[in-house]
Regions:
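N-terminal pre-Walker A segment at the start of P-loop NTPase domains
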Residues: 1-30
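Accessory nucleic acid-recognition modules appended to NTPase machines
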Residues: 3, 69, 215-374
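Short glycine-rich substrate-engagement loop in P-loop NTPases that contacts/grips substrate
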Residues: 73-105
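Domain-level recognition of nuclease-like catalytic cores that cleave nucleotide substrates
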Residues: 414-443
């Protein structure tokens, strides 16, 4: 290591120990409590991973840990451009040079942001877990810190923590409008404000920097997120040989949220436009887009692996705000945006999600199994106020309910009041706002 690099690392250690946590909006993210594991904070670009690291640091500070035991170190610094795995030892020695009294005597915590820019960082982190009393958080761009790669490179020594864009509750919290009471207990003005806030959320989405942005700026901002993720996390990382086909695929998926995606049909559509690409390549591109967290794909809920493979998957963007900037008609599609928001909320809650198709051909949007083993059949629509709409949206639930007797069949709508017509047993209804806020089913 050259002396200038060593001096820079030592300076950044001192700065990282002195810095106060910046203002942040608290995220409702589950942290695994398993000793001896590094926590890898992953997620879509600009979803708020760095601020979440600061939240974790602030929580330990509030729990009484001395500030000097909590080191935040950001590796995305042009002065560290030549840093190699062997140079990481100076991070360890430089810290304990300042606090030798704590080595092997008390636990400290390292928050390593953007550590993936250092080649071979994984071996250093594994060695710290094995030989030092250090709790470790790592975070980085999805270009090089993918969940399946973390699992492989860390050899079981890391657990992933997935940070999504803001949920509805987090977006309200960010705006200083988080309700302190359940929806049913709010006054009329409060319920109306929440109804408007949900509709705004389905259009604006949950990316932190997009909150409060005017429509023109928000569209440009979100497009830049998509463009950077596609360029750096897919094209450059995987050396994509057919970027035109990749761009067509991404535009198709983002402009057709919740629609079944058939590789064969998309392959035929590209051929009709004179774009030559192999079907295996389309499969690979879809996987890459999922890895960057741009796209979430939901397969058929079935115990048959073959059935899952031969049936199309339904693709959703990672955030409802991405729908409006790619919607070809230019209209706000609240139904698809709500369905997207529900899926991403199920992911936040750790659910295993698939869609259901009954023998009669009816489809239920989601079958979800939560970590508490509860199961749900969920149908999502913007409104069920009209009798014909209610009948159309509930018949799939009615057909699927006997096939999944252990699951609660639930209709979610933007309406704040239940449908005028009673639902057939055992179907239940809940306002999407109440469900997204985590409220229990009404009695």
């Amino acid at each position: 290591m050259n002396g200038q690099l060593a001096d820079t690392i030592q300076l950044k250690i001192a700065d990282g120990l002195a810095a106060l946590p910046p203002p942040f909006t608290r995220r409702d993210v589950h942290l695994p409590a398993i000793p001896g594991k590094a926590l890898a904070v992953i997620g879509m670009r600009r979803a708020g991973k760095t601020y979440f690291l600061w939240q974790c640091l602030a929580d330990r500070l509030a729990a009484g840990e001395p500030r000097a035991t909590l080191l935040y170190f950001n590796f995305e610094d042009e002065r560290l451009a030549e840093m190699q795995a062997g140079d990481l030892q100076h991070l360890l020695e430089g810290y304990f040079r300042l606090h030798p009294e704590w080595r092997d005597r008390r636990r400290v915590t390292f928050f390593c942001d953007e550590i993936q820019v250092v080649p071979g960082w994984e071996t250093f982190i594994r060695r710290l877990l094995d030989s030092e009393q250090i709790d470790i958080f790592v975070s980085g761009s999805s270009a090089r810190l993918l969940s399946r790669e973390v699992a492989t490179s860390m050899r079981g020594r890391a657990l992933e923590v997935l940070v999504h864009p803001f949920s509805l509750r987090e977006a309200l919290r960010h705006a200083g409008a988080e309700p302190a009471q359940p929806l049913a207990a709010l006054p009329k003005a409060g319920r109306s404000a929440l109804e408007k806030a949900l509709r705004d959320y389905l259009i604006l989405g949950g990316f932190p920097e997009a909150q409060g942005a005017v429509e023109r700026d928000r569209g440009a901002l979100l497009r830049s997120y998509v463009d950077v993720a596609m360029l750096r996390d897919v094209i450059e990382r995987h050396q994509v040989s057919n970027p035109t086909a990749l761009r067509w695929l991404l535009r198709h998926l983002l402009s057709n949220p919740a629609a079944p995606f058939s590789v064969q049909k998309f392959y035929d559509a590209l051929r009709s436009q004179g774009i030559a690409v192999a079907k295996d390549t389309i499969h690979a591109y879809l996987t890459h887009l999922e890895d960057t967290f741009l796209i979430r794909a939901v397969g058929l809920h079935t115990s048959s692996a073959r059935q899952r493979m031969v049936n199309p998957r339904k693709a959703y963007p990672v955030d409802p705000g991405l729908i409006q900037i790619y919607e070809r008609s230019g209209r706000a599609n609240l139904g698809h945006a709500l369905e997207t928001a529900v899926l991403i909320e199920l992911e936040r809650r750790g659910a295993d999600v698939g869609y259901v198709r009954t023998p009669d051909g009816y489809e239920v949007d989601f079958h979800a199994q939560l970590p508490d083993e509860s199961r749900w059949l969920m149908q999502v629509c913007a409104t069920a106020a009209a009798a014909d709409t209610l009948e159309r949206e509930t018949r799939a639930l009615v057909a699927a309910a006997p096939l999944y007797p252990e699951a609660t069949p639930l209709l979610l709508t933007l309406d704040l009041t239940p449908p005028a017509q009673a639902l057939p047993a055992p179907l239940r209804w809940q306002s999407a706002a109440a469900w997204l806020l985590g409220e229990p089913l009404p009695a």
